[in-house]
């Protein structure tokens, strides 16, 4: 059964590590989950064919099959991305934190793409496990969002302000 809209209140703690993104999501009913995902994504080619999935009341390995379309003023673009293991398995060009570029965590798009994808998939998985349907729209109210910055960026007040503005 497909319902049009679901509304969720969540609290999220997210650590976008250079190699792995660790995310804890807690829902208003007290349930929560922790996921660990490779910190990388791959843009989806406009010519790429992605197989259709049949509607199901179960999402198997949702953390391994993230395919997201993100429209965000922080990214200044609307794009489709494969995230984590889905990106690795795609054969597409991978984008990760370029630690040698010395950009930090505030500037790169990956700092927004990873948590947005993980929050969306956690919300979908929660709705499927509790209500057993796939909504067309999920409205998420983040009551709390906690993230980490390297000390070198945290001590810089302007970098903190920039991250808050992006979020």
Predicted features along the sequence, with ranges:
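Nucleotide/phosphate-binding catalytic cleft detector across ATP-hydrolyzing
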Residues: 1-18, 22-167
């Amino acid at each position: 059964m497909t319902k049009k809209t679901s509304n969720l209140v969540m609290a999220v703690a997210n650590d976008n590590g250079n190699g792995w993104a660790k995310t804890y999501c807690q829902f208003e009913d007290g349930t929560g989950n922790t996921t660990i995902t490779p910190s990388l994504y791959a843009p989806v080619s406009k010519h790429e064919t992605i197989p259709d999935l049949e509607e199901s009341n179960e999402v198997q390995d949702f953390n391994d099959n993230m395919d997201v379309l993100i429209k965000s003023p922080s990214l200044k673009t609307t794009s489709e991305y494969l995230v984590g293991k889905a990106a690795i398995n795609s054969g597409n060009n991978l984008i990760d934190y370029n630690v040698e570029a010395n950009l930090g965590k505030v500037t790169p798009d990956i700092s927004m793409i990873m948590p947005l994808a993980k929050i969306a998939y956690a919300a979908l998985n929660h709705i499927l496990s509790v209500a057993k349907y796939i909504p067309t729209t999920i409205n998420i109210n983040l009551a709390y969002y906690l993230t980490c910055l390297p000390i070198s960026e945290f001590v810089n007040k302007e970098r903190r302000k920039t991250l808050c503005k992006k979020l």
